[in-house]
A protein has these predicted regions:
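Charged, non-catalytic interaction/linker regions at domain boundaries
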Residues: 2-211, 225
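Amphipathic, oligomerization/interface secondary-structure segments
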Residues: 178-321
Length: 321
């Protein structure tokens, strides 16, 4: 893919003029030729950069995976956290990368319409024959901070979401998040584990959500991903099937509409949990424990009831709090 640089710059500057106009700061001659000044190296990056994947957390924070000439990059937009990983190195000059990101992603200016107006309206090719483009630093100052990190190794679809989760988990420590340090540590450890089948994309999105229920449901989906393990593994052994258990479960669901029972499967999975963790779950969810209480069953019932209260609304599930 070769990106049209004229079209990319037109998109970026057009977004800025629209932003100002919608807030009663119309830029004179909004269709005039304007672009971001760049050097030949930046032009080459803008032409060939490919946005492989991205995630947006509102209008001001975004994560992106870029590929440029078979080299892989991770970009953060609007993040306070600076990636601290030996596998990634911060690029000092991100010209070309920045225009690509601002063209491809729905990033909103982080300054006032008046500031956008003052920068964009200052010049154009139509008003000044000596115009050579807007200064890159001036245009970038209108948006949240962009950082680009080059990866020491190629990135794949399987790797990018754990990478994004690691970054978003660390970002949650910087302030304004309800996530405490211990939970952030657990999320970072989960990212490093890079477990097949876990919904890392959903986990990543929920880490910066202001509602804790979002993260609970994402973690619940992680547990759901293992529900078929017990039955599918038994079938694999009994029939001497060579395929992985999750492939067997997929075939069973597609061909026979079979899926594991949710509540009982949750208890089976929780049987592998540490006793201290199960006791902590019960304590958090106000479960009264007796000496003979089956911990996995008690924790499973409480988790499932909480899940139902979040997902459904029924009088029997409603609470006064």
């Amino acid at each position: 893919m070769v990106r049209n640089m004229i079209a990319a710059n037109k998109t970026l500057l057009g977004r800025l003029t629209d932003f100002a106009a919608q807030r009663d700061y119309p830029v004179p001659d909004p269709s005039a030729a304007r672009w971001v000044h760049a050097n030949p190296a930046a032009d080459e990056v803008l032409k060939v950069a490919v946005l492989r994947s991205s995630m947006s957390f509102g209008r001001f924070r975004h994560l992106a995976w870029l590929e440029v000439n078979e080299q892989h990059f991770v970009a953060t937009i609007g993040f306070d956290y600076e990636v601290d990983d030996p596998g990634f190195e911060l690029l000092e000059d991100i010209q070309g990368y920045d225009v690509c990101l601002l063209t491809e992603l729905p990033v909103s200016p982080s300054v006032s319409a008046a500031e956008v107006y003052n920068v964009v309206a200052a010049n154009s090719r139509d008003s000044d024959p000596e115009y050579h483009g807007h200064d890159n630093a001036q245009i970038m100052s209108l948006f949240p901070l962009i950082r680009v990190f080059v990866s020491a190794e190629p990135i794949t679809e399987e790797l990018i979401w754990p990478i994004f989760l690691s970054i978003s988990s660390e970002e949650s420590r910087t302030g304004g998040s309800w996530i405490e340090s211990e939970l952030a540590d657990c999320l970072s450890a989960l990212a490093e584990a890079n477990v097949d089948l876990l919904p890392y994309k959903e986990l990543c999105r929920s880490t910066l959500d202001l509602d804790p229920r979002s993260l609970f449901m994402s973690l619940y989906r992680c547990v759901e991903a293992t529900y078929a393990h017990d039955k599918a593994t038994k079938l694999k052994k009994d029939l001497s099937i060579e395929h992985e258990w999750h492939k067997i479960a997929e075939v069973l669901e597609n061909a026979m509409s079979w899926r594991p029972l949710e509540a009982s499967s949750l208890n089976v999975v929780l049987a592998f949990a540490k006793e201290d963790d199960l006791r902590e779950v019960c304590e958090c969810l106000n479960v009264t424990l007796q000496d003979d209480t089956n911990l996995p069953a008690a924790a499973g019932k409480a988790i499932y009831q909480l899940r139902n209260r979040i997902v459904h609304y029924r009088p029997a599930l409603a609470t006064s709090r």
